[in-house]
Structures are given as structure tokens and as C-alpha cells.
A protein has these predicted regions:
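N-terminal secretory signal peptides that target proteins for export/translocation
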Residues: 1-20
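Bacterial N-terminal signal peptides
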Residues: 23-35
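Sec/Tat signal peptide C-region and signal peptidase I cleavage site
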Residues: 35-41
Length: 360
């Protein structure tokens, strides 16, 4: 199924299907790309940072009117985070070690747990555009190994490829074998596809932002527990209907952490340059993830997956009930500290809206 030039309409909630069925004509295949998954449990959204501007205006401040807001389903704020010092990840923190501020006001911590055993939903987003021609086999091997080592019976993963199209190669599964079969079928596509810049002739490009938006909005938004997206890409987007801002916004609303592994066949295509890398750093930072640049080195790619795996094993979940109970739509800035000299990786804030608000 493929993402067309127009943004997908929100699909009706339904039980998770074993396969996708066609819901629209070929020109509107985007509406059939994904079903909303069955909710495992009701989960309160974790904090969200303000979405970044598009790369074309990345140096300009974000205007308040341009920022969409995030609904808080219950009066509880969840903060997933990891902590590191110069020697690596810290795994023995307690509630008493940490302090959380909302708009510079200390908040009483209600819950504090390690998240190693919480169900995990992983979306792998695989760039299959021309820049990946000689590194795709490396990505396939390392990605399959990562999921084989990370997935437990209570976890699930899905696989999306993106180039001139956005394709769902594997729907939710906890079978590493099924994911590997799907990864092995991924192939480079530089021809004509169904996703394009509207009104600009033959569809072409790399629909990175569209892929992130669809993965977050249509696949992860109704899932509970920990949710991550792992992008393997050179960071360059060409032809997406979505923007950096809207794709990050979708990830924030889904409470998904975005990790980006920058990889490309730079010998033939060069690197997309500072714009793509800067966009990926902004996307990762705003969602509580990070960027790992591996060039076109297979060993460094495996190490990048190992780093993500280690981070997932050392995450914490901190929850608190805001002292300001108003669901007034204001942006609440968060600042989390856990002792001196520790690097805390977490989201930067959230918007408080009433649970029954229809606005996204």
C-alpha cells in the first residue's frame, strides 16, 4: 500500500487486521496504508516538545499560532528518559535522585520505575531510495539482528520502506523471522511512484517525512507502553506532503521516541549535507531520541543498533500529576535533572488540553 500525494484521513478504529485490505482506488491508496492498531491499554501521553519549523525556516523562531497542541488524556504526565555520564548509562537511579520542573515549578514525583520490562512497540523505517543502493544489504542484516535480539513475546514491530513511495512491508508481529523475510524483500526504488509533490509532474523523491507521519499517526498513536521509531536514512527528504514540523508533531502526539541512524552510499551519491542531518537531529531531540551517524560502515551500523538496544534496557519512566491542573492548552516546559554531571535524554515539554477536545 502506498502514500499518495494528499495527507491521509484518519482511519476508523478497528481490531488489528492480519493483513491490509484495499479501501480506496489506486489514486487514494494512502487511505489504505495503515489500520489503526487495537489498543493494548489506555496510556496517558508523555510530554511533548514544541514541533520544529520546516527546514526551509529552521533558523526562525516558532510562532505560537503555528504550533499544534497535544491532548493529555488523564491528569498525569509521563516522562520516559535515560541518563548517562562519561562512563555510560546510569542504571541505579531512584526517585529521590531526580527532580522534575514544569514551567520552573517543582512537581512531586508520583511514580518512578525502570522500563526494561514494559511492552515495546518498534517501527523500523527503511530508506530504499537511490542513496542507499550499496548499503541496503548492511541495513537488512543489522536491522534483522537488532529485532531478533530486542523483541520479546510481549513486544511487537512493524517495517516500513520509503523512497518515492511509502510501503508497509510488515504489519505488527513479534516474530523476528517474519520481520527478516520482509526486510530481505526490501529493494531500491528510484522509478515513478504514487507519492509526489502535488502538481509537479511525475512523482519522485524520498518521502521521509510522510513515512514518519504515517508510522506515528496511523500505527503508533493508539498503542500503549514504550514506542520507538528507528530510521535508517541519509536524512534527506524530497517530495513529501508532510513537513519536518508535522512529522515531528505526529511522533510527539504518539509519544514515540525517534532514533535516526544516518547511513548512505556516499561514494556514489554524496551526503545530503547539513540540512538533512540538522533536520534529523531536531526530530530526534524533540522526541527524546538521538542521531547516530555511521557513514557507510557496517561495523558502525551494528554498533549503532547495539547502542539503541542498550538505551532501551536502561530507560526510566517518571510520572507526576501537575500542580497546575488546568487543561488550558498552554505549553508546559519540562526540565528534568538527576544529579550533577548526568546527561538526561527526555522530551522537553507538553501541551495540556482537555481529554474531550477534538483538536489535535
Amino acid at each position: 500500500m502506498r502514500h499518495s500525494a494528499s495527507r491521509p484521513a484518519e482511519l476508523p478504529r478497528a481490531a488489528r487486521p492480519s493483513s491490509l485490505r484495499l479501501l480506496a482506488p489506486a489514486a487514494l491508496l494512502v487511505c489504505a496504508l495503515f489500520y489503526l492498531p487495537q489498543m493494548r491499554a489506555q496510556d496517558a501521553p508523555s510530554p511533548s516538545g514544541p514541533p520544529p519549523p520546516s527546514s526551509a525556516a529552521s533558523s526562525e523562531p516558532i510562532q505560537q499560532d503555528d504550533i499544534q497542541t497535544l491532548k493529555v488524556g488523564v491528569n498525569l504526565v509521563n516522562v520516559y528518559f535515560s541518563a548517562r555520564d562519561k562512563n555510560g548509562y546510569i542504571t541505579n537511579l531512584t526517585k529521590d535522585d531526580c527532580n522534575i520542573q514544569e514551567n520552573k515549578v517543582d512537581q512531586p514525583i508520583k511514580n518512578f520505575t525502570k522500563e526494561k520490562n514494559l511492552p515495546l512497540t518498534i517501527g523500523i523505517l527503511l530508506d530504499t531510495s537511490g542513496s542507499q543502493t550499496n548499503v541496503l544489504p548492511l541495513e537488512q542484516e543489522a536491522g534483522a539482528r537488532f529485532l531478533r535480539e530486542v523483541l520479546t513475546p510481549k513486544d511487537e514491530a512493524f517495517l516500513i520502506s520509503f523512497d518515492i513511495n511509502v510501503d508497509l512491508l510488515a504489519d505488527y508481529t513479534n516474530s523476528p523471522r517474519e520481520i527478516k523475510r520482509a526486510i530481505d524483500k526490501a529493494s531500491i526504488n528510484t522509478g515513478t511512484g504514487s507519492g509526489s509533490v502535488t502538481g509537479h509532474g511525475q512523482p519522485r523523491g524520498t518521502l521521509l517525512f510522510d513515512a514518519v507521519y504515517l508510522a506515528a499517526h496511523d500505527k503508533l498513536r493508539q498503542e500503549a507502553g514504550r514506542k520507538i521509531l528507528v530510521l535508517l536514512t541519509d536524512g534527506g527528504d524530497q517530495g513529501s506532503q508532510e513537513t519536518l514540523k508535522t512529522s515531528v508533531e505526529a511522533a510527539q502526539k504518539a509519544n514515540a521516541i525517534v532514533y535516526v541512524i544516518l547511513i548512505a552510499d556516499r561514494g556514489n551519491f554524496g551526503t545530503f549535507g547539513s540540512i538533512g542531518a540538522a533536520d534529523m537531529r531536531r526530530m530526534a531531540s524533540e522526541t527524546g531520541g538521538r542521531v547516530i551517524d555511521v557513514g557507510n560502515n557496517g561495523r558502525r551500523l551494528e554498533d549503532a543498533f547495539d547502542q539503541i538496544q542498550e538505551e532501551l534496557r536502561t530507560q526510566y519512566l517518571l510520572s507526576y500529576t501537575p500542580l497546575n491542573p488546568k487543561t488550558d492548552g498552554t505549553y508546559r516546559k519540562l526540565e528534568l535533572t538527576c544529579g550533577k554531571g548526568l546527561n538526561i535524554q527526555a522530551r522537553k515539554g507538553y501541551y495540556a488540553l482537555a481529554a474531550d477536545s477534538d483538536k489535535d
